[in-house]
Regions:
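A short, N-terminal "cap"/entry segment at the start of jelly-roll beta-barrel domains
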Residues: 1-30, 71-73, 81, 117-135
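Short acidic-glycine-tyrosine-enriched beta hairpin
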Residues: 24-28, 36-37, 61, 66-86
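A short beta-loop-beta micro-motif enriched in histidine and acidic residues
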Residues: 26-27, 39-57
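Short histidine-centered beta-strand/loop micro-motifs
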Residues: 43-48, 66, 73, 92-95
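Short, well-ordered beta-strand segments in beta-rich or mixed alpha/beta enzyme
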Residues: 58, 76-79, 104-108
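Ligand-binding loop in jelly-roll beta-barrel domains
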Residues: 70-71, 84-114
């Protein structure tokens, strides 16, 4: 039986198309599932210095905030991304107090560079003008 290419194309649903600012040569790629319990504040403010990250919400709702962007809710079946480099990721909190949050994230990183670096309070204060005020 011959495979019908149209069947393959009908099976694919594109949820996100991004042109990342950079992908390091000799990049390493890590795909992880992160699980936050109901009401969790998620990871502290951090960055991905070695490259961009791409994610997809599997369960629950994420309160997502990047430096320079207003916070937004990402729901099941929706995708998100971070440019990496110097941009601070302020929130990946569970937006719900009644159900857990599970999301998949694929991080691209230059060899020898940490996948994630927590941002300290002094730097957060120095860069507070880059954060979009919550409404």
């Amino acid at each position: 039986m011959m495979f019908d290419t149209a069947d393959l194309m009908n099976a694919i649903t594109t949820i996100q198309t991004i042109t990342p600012p950079f992908i390091p040569s000799d990049a390493e790629v890590m795909t992880s599932i992160i699980e936050w319990p109901a009401g969790s504040a998620g990871a502290p403010p951090h960055r991905h210095p070695g490259g961009p990250s791409f994610g997809y919400v599997l369960e629950g709702e994420m309160l997502f905030e990047l430096e320079g962007e207003a916070p937004r809710v990402i729901k099941v079946g929706e995708a998100f991304w971070e440019p990496g480099g110097d941009v601070i990721h302020y929130s990946d909190a569970n937006n719900r107090s009644d159900i857990p949050l599970r999301f998949l994230v694929t991080m691209i990183c230059a060899p020898g560079v940490p996948m994630l670096v927590v941002v300290d309070e002094d730097e957060l204060e120095q860069r507070r003008d880059r954060r979009v005020p919550r409404q």
